[in-house]
Amino acid sequence: MMAAFVAVVLLAGGGAYGARQAWLQKHRQEYAEQGLACLESQDYAQAITAFDDAIALTHGRIGTFESQMMLYRAEAQYRSGDYQSALAIYESLYAKDESNETYKTGLALCLLETGDYDRAKSLGVIQGQVYSRIAKDQINAGNYDDALSTIETGFSEAGADEVGREELTYNQAVAWEYKGDYKKALEILEGYDQKYTAEGNAARELAFLRTRQGNH
C-alpha cells in the first residue's frame, strides 16, 4: 500500500514539474517576442525590460536561450547609446566563447565607441571599421596624411568588412577634400556613390564637391 502511495505522489509531482516547465517556456518565449518587437520599433528601454524578464525566468541558468537573450539585450543597449552596459554583456559572452564571431563583433563595436581601438583591433573582426574610426579621429585632429595612410592600411585589412570599406572610402574622400584636392575627393566620392549610393552627409559632400570644380 505504501509503495502504491509513493508511486502516485511521484507521478503527481512529475506532472506538476512538467506543467511548471511548460509555463516557464511559454512565458520566456512571450517575453522574448515582446523584446524583439520593441527592438524592431526602437523602444529600447522596453526591449531591455522584456529580455530581462525572459532571463529572470531561467533562475540563473545560462544556456543557449539565456545567451541569446543577453545578446539581444546588449544590442538594445548598444542601439540606445549605453555602450558601457552593452560592453559588459559582450565581455561576459565573449569570456564564455572566444571563438564566437557575433560576440567578437559586438565587443569590437562597443570598444570602438568607448575608445579602446587597440583592443578592438586585436579581436581581428570589423578591421575596416576600426581603421576608419582611427582615421576619422586623425582627420578631426587635422592629420590628413596620417589619416590617408591609416585608410590604406584599413583597405588592406578590411577583408569581408564591407561596412568598413564603405566608411573608409567616405573618410578617404573627406581627407582629400580637407587637404584641398577637390578633384581627387570628388573622384573618390563619385565612385562611392556608384557603389553604395551617397545619402545624408555623403550626398551633401558630393553636392559641395561638384560646386568646387574649377576652384582647385
Feature locations, PLM:
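TPR-repeat structural position
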Residues: 44-45, 83, 117, 144, ...
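Register position in tetratricopeptide repeats
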Residues: 40, 79, 113-114, 137-141, ...
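Short coil turns that delineate tetratricopeptide repeat
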Residues: 59, 64, 98, 125, ...
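Start-of-helix register in tetratricopeptide repeats
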Residues: 29, 63-68, 102, 129, ...
